[in-house]
């Protein structure tokens, strides 16, 4: 699915924030933040619902993002490896899940010398009543959610195929991700980044945005590698000629999510392309970086995305 969205005017210069506006900034990171576009994001100028942020138990849920923004977390220059990731939060394209787990992951990436560009991409616009329903806490005795059976074709694990509103939001989110890749590469020298080692990490629907960005195939706006944390493709996949290496992580019982990522892995292997898949027997939505991070960073070294760790004498 190629985004039917014309590129907007990117925010050409990011603003250095020195006043501690993000209290949870990883220690030692330099932080920049700015709107992704100058003026309104192209295509969604008519959106009017206000942004709503809800916090609970260290998690942050942000609804009605209509003006995407980026925040950049850089490791110290002396530790920078040249690798960078655009981080795409999850939330079913309806909300962005941020907070403690996101901060933990960014700190871990910075600790490995990897720059992180956190993108808050556009999401479905919800009324106040819809947000109240979506953000209501689950009863303590509620059974775990059951996932409807979904036939996976061409690795497409979209649970709501044909939903026009979600299809539109996915196009907008992909356009935002493309613009973020362009922005990141344009600042490569300043941020000590190799423009040929800029990948994406997407959680849940964020993984779908990453795969959509890959499939759009825009020059200068495709990821050099993709890390997906229980985030399958949300559209039919054809393996591109310049297919990036994949690192896929999921729970073993996450229904169509697991099935979709298994299908993606099989497609890459059928083409003798680098891909690694880990399916953990853990509760759904419990995939913290402490579970998969060590193996991921070893894989990044094996793929020459990161420098190898010097051997101990």
Regions found by a protein language model. Name each.
Residues 262-265, 269-313:
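C-terminal catalytic histidine-bearing segment of alpha/beta-hydrolase fold enzymes
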Residues 81-90:
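Short beta-strand element of the alpha/beta-hydrolase
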Residues 30-79:
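N-terminal cap/lid segment of alpha/beta-hydrolase-fold proteins
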Residues 171-243:
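Primarily recognizes the serine-hydrolase "nucleophile elbow" in alpha/beta-hydrolase
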């Amino acid at each position: 699915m190629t985004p039917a969205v014309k590129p907007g005017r990117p925010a050409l210069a990011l603003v250095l924030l020195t006043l501690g506006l993000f209290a949870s900034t990883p220690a030692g990171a330099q932080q920049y933040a700015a709107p992704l576009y100058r003026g309104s994001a192209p295509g969604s100028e008519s959106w009017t619902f206000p942004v709503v942020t809800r916090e609970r138990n260290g998690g942050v849920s942000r609804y009605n993002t209509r003006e995407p923004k980026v925040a950049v977390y850089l490791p110290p220059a002396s530790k920078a490896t040249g690798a960078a990731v655009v981080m795409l939060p999850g939330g079913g394209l309806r909300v962005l899940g941020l907070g403690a787990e996101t901060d933990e992951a960014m700190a871990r990436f910075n600790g490995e010398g990897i720059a992180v560009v956190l993108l808050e991409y556009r999401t479905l616009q919800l009324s106040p009543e819809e947000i109240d329903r979506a953000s209501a806490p689950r009863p303590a005795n509620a059974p775990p959610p059951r996932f409807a059976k979904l036939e996976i074709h061409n690795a497409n694990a979209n649970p709501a195929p044909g939903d026009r509103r979600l299809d539109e939001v996915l196009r907008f989110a992909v356009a935002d991700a493309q613009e973020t890749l362009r922005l990141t590469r344009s600042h490569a020298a300043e941020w000590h980044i190799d423009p040929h080692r800029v990948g994406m990490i997407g959680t849940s629907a964020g993984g779908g945005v990453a795969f959509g960005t890959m499939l759009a195939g825009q020059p200068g706006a495709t990821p050099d590698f993709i890390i997906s944390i229980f985030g399958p493709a949300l559209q039919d996949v054809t393996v591109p000629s310049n297919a990036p290496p994949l690192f896929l992580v999921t729970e073993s019982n996450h229904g169509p999510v697991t099935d979709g990522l298994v299908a993606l892995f099989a497609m890459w292997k059928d083409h003798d392309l680098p891909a690694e898949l880990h399916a953990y027997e853990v509760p759904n939505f419990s995939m913290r970086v402490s579970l998969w991070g060590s193996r991921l960073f070893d894989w990044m070294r094996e793929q020459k995305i990161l420098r190898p760790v010097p051997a101990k004498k």
